[in-house]
């Protein structure tokens, strides 16, 4: 970008992104631009949503795992359930991300039905926010965003993740 041509980026202390899946090529390109302008930060991924005061997960320093949005922030709990249920899926399997903790909203203003669908009391007695986002979790507890349920494409009876299509496009 012409705006950054003469910029001194040595002042950057951190840089993070959490909008959607971050392709490795974009991460590397960003870090290269920062390095050429005197900076040394790594671009780390995180995850958040409005219903949970935005930032809920982040990648700890020097713990980069390609495709991961990190681990839950302190005082937050996360688990993966089979979509439409409260049943936890095995580690490594995909399912809907649920969150519990002090950052989770109390409900939607004047929308009790939507609140009841989104905030559910599970068998452990805690209120869990059903995010509508599909994730998987590694053995080490790192979470991997797959897609927003509302963005899933159905093609010939198969579920296709937009990120799969985007990954192919990024290679070309």
What are these regions (language model features)?
Residues 2-68, 77:
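Gly/Ser/Thr-rich phosphate-binding loop
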Residues 7-10, 92, 129:
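Structured loop/turn residues at beta-strand edges in well-structured enzyme cores
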Residues 19, 48, 70, 101, ...:
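Active-site glycine-centered loops adjacent to acidic/histidine catalytic or metal-binding residues
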Residues 67-72, 88, 118, 125-127:
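Short Gly/Pro-enriched turn/cap motifs at secondary-structure boundaries
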Residues 79-98, 117, 121, 139-140:
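Conserved beta-loop-beta connector loops within the AMP-binding
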Residues 101, 106-107, 117, 125-126, ...:
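AMP-binding/adenylate-forming catalytic core of the ANL superfamily
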Residues 112-116:
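A short helix/loop element that forms part of the nucleotide-sugar donor recognition site in Leloir-type
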